[in-house]
Amino acid sequence: YGPVFSVWLDGACGEGPNGKVQVYDWQRIYDTVRALAPEAVISVCGPDVRWCGNEAGSVRANEWSVVPASLREAERTAEKSQKADDGEFSRQVASGDEDLGSREALADYCGPLAWYPAEVNTSTRKGWFHHDAEDSQVRSVDELFSIWKGSVGGNATFLLNVPPNRHGLLADADVEVLARLGDKVADFRSRRIDASRVDDNDDVTLCFDAPRSVSAIVLEEDIAQGQRIDEAVVTSSMNGEEDREIARVHCVGYRRIITLETPVTATQVRVTVTKSRQGFYLADAYGIEA
């Protein structure tokens, strides 16, 4: 089967016929994974990757990887939240909270922080298991592509469940939509616009060799240096004319795909970081052709 790269622990714990509820020895599970598959990440009820808070494929407008460390405990409780009460900070910290890591969310927080990036998880169908009657209800490629852009392009990882049927095979409907999704992702990546890059303090300017129709901007921080950008303004211009604002975001992370409502024609796109946490490291920035 190849190497184990992820161990997904969702915390589900139903009662047995005698009414007894299983109690998990979480630390023993973690220690076993670390010993047998040290490169694997432990997700959801684990210390490495957190649940985004829903199973619909919805994403936050601004996803932070630096969050209260108590979120590492959040999914271990039956009510799916963890009460943090250490004398310095007392509030309910839940995976589904809309704002987990902004300056405002952390303003009164005195507890420890953790690098705990999010995972968006959903299914090709309305549920996690295969039912023959749902073969005509597989999600459309456009919907899945939108979720991909929002998650992978929103500083989160993306887990897409594809349920096998009773024969251990993937249904033709799922296979078809996956192939089409792969084509759309490949097409998106192939439309990267070649540009020269000029860095000047808080500005990163992309200069095109000719007017280009831009439908999206992709920004990527060097997360080895942390997640630092609090706000960035994107502007465009034609042949040295005055810049006009086309987008504004409040965090970036390892990747932020900014899809423009209407493509813009430009010879230059500038990203200005207006707020950051002790500077920033923008590893990559590029436009996507319409």
Could you describe each region identified by the protein language model?
Residues 268-270:
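Short, conserved beta-strand segments of beta-strand-rich sandwich/propeller modules, principally
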